[in-house]
C-alpha cells in the first residue's frame, strides 16, 4: 500500500485519486465555526476537473452549519473512504484539506445530491491510503 504522509503532502490530485473520487459519491466533511468546535457530516462530493477543486453539496446546503462554518473561517477538510474487502483487510482513503468557499448558486448542475448552494474546497494538503 502507498502512503502520502502530511509531511510530504502533494497539493494536486493524482490520476488514481481523481478516478477514486469519481467512483465515490459520498464523503465526510469536517469544518469548524467561529467557536472553533469541530463539525463532521456526510455529504455529496465531486471532483471539479476544470478547476482542480472538490465540490461538496447536499440539499439546502445554505441553511446548514457546514455552510456557515465555511463562511466564518474559510477552511474545510473532506474524507472519502471505503472498504474494498475485509479478508484481506483492504481500506482506501483520501483526505483533502484546504481553503473553502461557500458558493450560493450553481450547484444543481454538479450532479446528484447537489442543491443550488455548495462548498468548494481548494486542495492544499492531500493524504491517501490504498489509492494508487
Identify the residue ranges that each predicted region occupies.
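Binding-site signature for planar aromatic cofactors or substrates
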Residues: 1-132
Amino acid at each position: 500500500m502507498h502512503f502520502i504522509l502530511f509531511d510530504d503532502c502533494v497539493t494536486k490530485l493524482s490520476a488514481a485519486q481523481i478516478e477514486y473520487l469519481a467512483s465515490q459519491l459520498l464523503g465526510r466533511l469536517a469544518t469548524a465555526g467561529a467557536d472553533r468546535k469541530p463539525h463532521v457530516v456526510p455529504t455529496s462530493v465531486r471532483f471539479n476537473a476544470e478547476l482542480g477543486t472538490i465540490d461538496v453539496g447536499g440539499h439546502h446546503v445554505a441553511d446548514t452549519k457546514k455552510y456557515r462554518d465555511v463562511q466564518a473561517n474559510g477552511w474545510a477538510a473532506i474524507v472519502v473512504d471505503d472498504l474494498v474487502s475485509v479478508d484481506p483487510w483492504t481500506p482506501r482513503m483520501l483526505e483533502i484539506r484546504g481553503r473553502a468557499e461557500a458558493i450560493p448558486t450553481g450547484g444543481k448542475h454538479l450532479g446528484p445530491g447537489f442543491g443550488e448552494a455548495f462548498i468548494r474546497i481548494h486542495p492544499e494538503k492531500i493524504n491517501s491510503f490504498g489509492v494508487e
